[in-house]
């Protein structure tokens, strides 16, 4: 009930897009991302193979057979580079030392937009009081902006034994991979979810006014705040998001078989019976000339929804420019 017209418009449009994507032919987002695999291999699991190579082969075949966009650019020198034409290399991290006979996987397709909205801030203990931390978060929430396609799944990690550990924690938390962490610390220095600060950050995001791309309340779906141990002289803080496409899935291989997380296959059940009631968008005919278009636009605030018709010249960004190389 508190959603703005723009919030409603974005939510409804995204649900319609999900219904199309659920048919398995067109992806939710044309940026089908860097393929990331985070795996934990039980100490009793023996494959007799180059696991990373096998996973990379699966990435290659999937992107080729499903006609997904190739986004990886490979360098030949510091200056010269070209699209790999396969979406390889993938990021594959395999960890061992876990007891048992299970091979667990988290697969993420991370688009450039959400990856670019990953930030590391090197802070100190001076940040660790309610007033300073609240001010810091209010300030840096605006670093996210809207170019990574909100509503976001927002993750914040405060602390970490290293900068890379802090950043890795944020990536996993934004995918919901750390949801089962404990909710309090201990003398052993375990990481934990701070549920109180998750509520505080959620409130900050809703009151920011940024909204779901065009102003409003729903900048984020949800928030994960992870507190981690740190070196006494350091306090890394990482902020990152999973975008509205939110493409991640868990899997595991056990002696009983192969198991894949079941995702929603019928998003249409979330659609309202009727489109949400919204104020009409402003109609603009681009063929009437830029002077007239500008005169119309100056009458309306930023965040006004527009219906454009006429000749539209599209400037392709650098990611798309590399695809045909």
What is the predicted role of each segment?
Residues 1-156, 161-277:
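Non-transmembrane, aqueous-exposed alpha-helical and coiled segments at domain scale
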Residues 276, 282, 302:
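Cofactor-/ligand-binding subdomain signature composed of acidic, glycine-rich
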